[in-house]
């Protein structure tokens, strides 16, 4: 039996440009902390496929604290346990940002958030699949179904809305820090 770390490393090497997905996700998570955006995470069959990547720092003592970090077998992330935690924030419709793998399976099946009336952003430089060719097909479907397919930087500036907010300087600093990685991530993951 493979250890969770070995399973993660094997899975990591199978995903097209996986380190770039992680890099963009790290940028978004850091900005989420500054902007007080709640974070929800899921892991697909933790016992079989391993833990969510440790470098994201999810629920680590000095890391990103999630509202819920749920293990699941369903392909959508919007499983009952996560849905319960999500609606503990209130019943109003929300804007939801989706990142992760695999774009044509778990990311696409999270369209059920749209059916619940939420606005869904899929971050093109933070999703991928084992087969790179699946990604543009999945993003086209997501867009056709009503999701906003955008980039991490575009989303962050839309989220802030105004350079006059107190968090602007901190988020702009994160964007600047990740500038080179963002350019490389876009070149690798956003071939439309």
Give the predicted meaning of each segment.
Residues 1-13:
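Generic N-terminal amphipathic, Lys/Arg-enriched alpha-helix
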């Amino acid at each position: 039996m493979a250890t969770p770390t070995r399973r993660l490393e094997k899975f990591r090497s199978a995903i097209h440009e996986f380190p770039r997905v992680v890099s963009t996700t790290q940028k978004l998570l850091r900005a989420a902390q500054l902007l007080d955006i709640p974070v929800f995470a899921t892991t697909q069959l933790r016992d079989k496929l391993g833990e969510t990547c440790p470098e994201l720092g999810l629920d680590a003592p000095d890391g990103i604290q999630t509202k819920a970090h749920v293990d699941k077998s369903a392909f959508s992330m919007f499983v009952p346990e996560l849905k319960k935690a999500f609606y503990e924030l209130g019943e109003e419709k929300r804007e939801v940002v989706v990142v992760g793998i695999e774009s044509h399976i778990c990311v696409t099946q999270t369209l059920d958030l749209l059916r619940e009336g939420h606005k869904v952003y899929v971050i093109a430089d933070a999703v991928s699949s084992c087969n790179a060719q699946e990604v543009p097909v999945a993003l086209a479907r997501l867009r056709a179904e009503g999701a906003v397919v955008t980039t991490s930087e575009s989303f962050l500036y839309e989220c802030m809305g105004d350079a006059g907010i107190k968090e602007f300087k901190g988020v702009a600093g994160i964007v600047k820090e990740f500038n080179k990685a963002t350019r490389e991530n876009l070149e690798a993951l956003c071939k439309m």
